[in-house]
Amino acid sequence: MNKIIGFIRLEIESGKASPSPPVGPALGLRGVNIMQFCKEFNNRCKQLNIKDGVPVPTIITVYDDKTFSFKMKTPSITYFIKKHLEISKGASKPGKENFLNIDIRSLYEIAEIKKIDSNLDIKSICKSLIGSVKSMGIKTIIVKN
């Protein structure tokens, strides 16, 4: 078994891994074959049907023989919230102004996606999501049918 010499954490846009920064320099410092990583990452994005341009948090494990393995995670909570609400950023003064509302059902759907990466139950993930939207100046509402 190869010895692990390090971990590299990067957020890479799906389908767009290339030797340019931040990927190239981070992998080059550890002696990893950059082009091989880029090809494998982009191929895995295609296999998983991840849309191009989605930021994918990636943890790359580098071994002593300069080989690597990597794990892709789901995008950040803020990415999903901004995408759902079609905004580019949160409020400039969160806590003092709420400029948008989000339905609790939408947060539940995001929590279902984030559950893949987490050991937490869905209730805990939803609580975390509520805190995230609050820090972005977004109010959580319950819509009754």
From Swiss-Prot:
Gene3D superfamilies noted in UniProt: Ribosomal protein L11, C-terminal domain (1.10.10.250), Ribosomal protein L11/L12, N-terminal domain (3.30.1550.10)
InterPro entries: Ribosomal_uL11 (IPR000911), Ribosomal_uL11_bac-typ (IPR006519), Ribosomal_uL11_C (IPR020783), Ribosomal_uL11_C_sf (IPR036769), Ribosomal_uL11_N (IPR020784), Ribosomal_uL11_N_sf (IPR036796)
Cysteine-cysteine disulfides: none
Subcellular location per the Swiss-Prot or TrEMBL entry: Mitochondrion
GO biological process terms, semicolon-separated: translation
Cellular component aspect of the GO annotation: mitochondrial large ribosomal subunit
One Pfam family, short name: Ribosomal_L11_N
One annotated GO molecular function: large ribosomal subunit rRNA binding
Keywords, ordered alphabetically: Mitochondrion, Ribonucleoprotein, Ribosomal protein
Family statement drawn from the similarity comment of this UniProt entry: Belongs to the universal ribosomal protein uL11 family.
Descriptive protein name: Large ribosomal subunit protein uL11m
Species name: Reclinomonas americana
UniProt lineage: Eukaryota, Discoba, Jakobida, Histionina, Histionidae
